[in-house]
Structures are given as structure tokens and as C-alpha cells.
Design a protein with these regions (language model features):
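Extended, compositionally simple hydrophobic/Ser/Thr-rich segments
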Residues: 1-142
């Protein structure tokens, strides 16, 4: 979606799914099953995806928007650039990487491994007891 507006969708089953917002729109969806999920928020938009099941997930926020994910994935790559938030503490991943550049925040849940990189005042909060690869700042337990 580009610009403003709202999109809703439920009970989505597919191989690859790419969902993106560029602008101030909102996307709400639930009950998604796919192999490869790509999620992108650019601008001030908000995305909420509930009850997602995916093998691989890549989610990014650039700007002041918010992405909220719940469900499960085998592997996840999260990135925030700017002041946005990526809230995935109810999205259980076996293996995850989280990168924040700016003042944004990532909240995630990893069971086996979590790699964290931060620059600026942003932070990463996590659930689970994963093996950690992280810098000295910007990481906290939820």
C-alpha cells in the first residue's frame, strides 16, 4: 500500500507473502500461513499481523511506523531504522537477528539464538533463553 488507507485480510495461505506500507496507511490481518514472509513499513503506517505461521520472516520498519507480529517462525530477521517500533515478543522464532539504527525499538522472542546490533539510542528487548550474540548496549530481557 502506498499513501493512506486501510487494508484488512484474514485466512491467507500461500508460499511467499510480501506485505508493505509506504506512507500512513494501516494493515491488519490474521491467520496467515506461508513459507516466506516479508513485512515492510516505511513512513508512519501501522501493521498488525496476528496468528502468523512462517518458515522464514523478514520484517523492517523505516521511519516512525509500527509493525506488530504474533505467531511463530523458524527464522526471523528484524530491522528498524529511525524511531519506529517492531513488536514481535509474541512471535516465537527459533533463530532471530535484530538490528536497530536510530531511536527505535525491537521486541522479539527467540528460543535458540539471537543476534543483536544497535546504533544510536535504540534498543532490543527479548523473551526466551537463546544463545546471545550482542553488543554491550541496547539489549534487555523482557
Amino acid at each position: 500500500m502506498a499513501g493512506s488507507g486501510d487494508i484488512s485480510g484474514n485466512n491467507i495461505s500461500c508460499t511467499d507473502l510480501d506485505i508493505s506500507i509506504a506512507g500512513s496507511g494501516d494493515i491488519n490481518s490474521s491467520d496467515i500461513t506461508c513459507n516466506d514472509l516479508q513485512v515492510s513499513v516505511a513512513g508512519s503506517g501501522d501493521m498488525k499481523l496476528n496468528n502468523v505461521t512462517a518458515n522464514f520472516t523478514r520484517a523492517s520498519v523505516a521511519g516512525s511506523g509500527t509493525a506488530i507480529l504474533s505467531g511463530s517462525t523458524q527464522e526471523a530477521e528484524y530491522s528498524v531504522a529511525g524511531s519506529g517500533d517492531l513488536l514481535a515478543s509474541d512471535f516465537v522464532a527459533k533463530k532471530a537477528s535484530a538490528s536497530v539504527a536510530g531511536s527505535g525499538d525491537i521486541k522479539c522472542h527467540a528460543t535458540d539464538f539471537l543476534k543483536v546490533r544497535t546504533s544510536g539510542s535504540g534498543s532490543v528487548g527479548y523473551k526466551g533463553n537463546p544463545e546471545l550474540d550482542y553488543p554491550k548496549k541496547g539489549l534487555y530481557k523482557l
